[in-house]
Amino acid sequence: MERYIFRIRQDGLYILDINETNKKIEKIGKVLAKFEPEKILVVSSRIYGFKPVLAFGQKIGAKTITKRFIPGSLTNPNCEDFIEPEIVILTDPRADYQILREAGLAKIPVIALCDSENYLSNVDLVVPTNNKGKKALALVYYLIAREMLKAKGQIKEGEEPPFSIDDFKSKDEED
């Protein structure tokens, strides 16, 4: 993640390069546009990721997992919860380690929202972002959904999508 760090404050806080984040979001929107929405799996085991992930799934048509991931769901066809996505989006590769591992075994590409402390092993595309803050997660999932619709030609450049960032925020969030 070092290449995505803009600077380190005196108190030790890592500041990510927002230009890199923006480039990655645009690229990921184009990548996701190549997949049928129902073949995209979006996962968050972090509580602050639940609402943005569910909103993303609803607005785009992707499958979502916000409860405990059942081991074997990507690798064991005999598992009751077996699914075969073509691409996986993880809110936090550390918290969602089991699905990251299984996606690697099943040769499924992985997009991950990563903060400065995350490792990029088994991650194919990264979005450098704060993956623990509820406002940051709402914004990133909103932007990815918007860029995906742009890449599919469903909205024009400069046009707003048929949903707002508020759809991705938790009810308890204040502006």
Regions found by a protein language model. Name each.
Residues M1-P162, K169:
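Ribosome large-subunit tunnel/peptidyl-transferase-proximal elements
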Residues I165-D175:
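Charge-patterned, long linear interaction tracts outside catalytic cores
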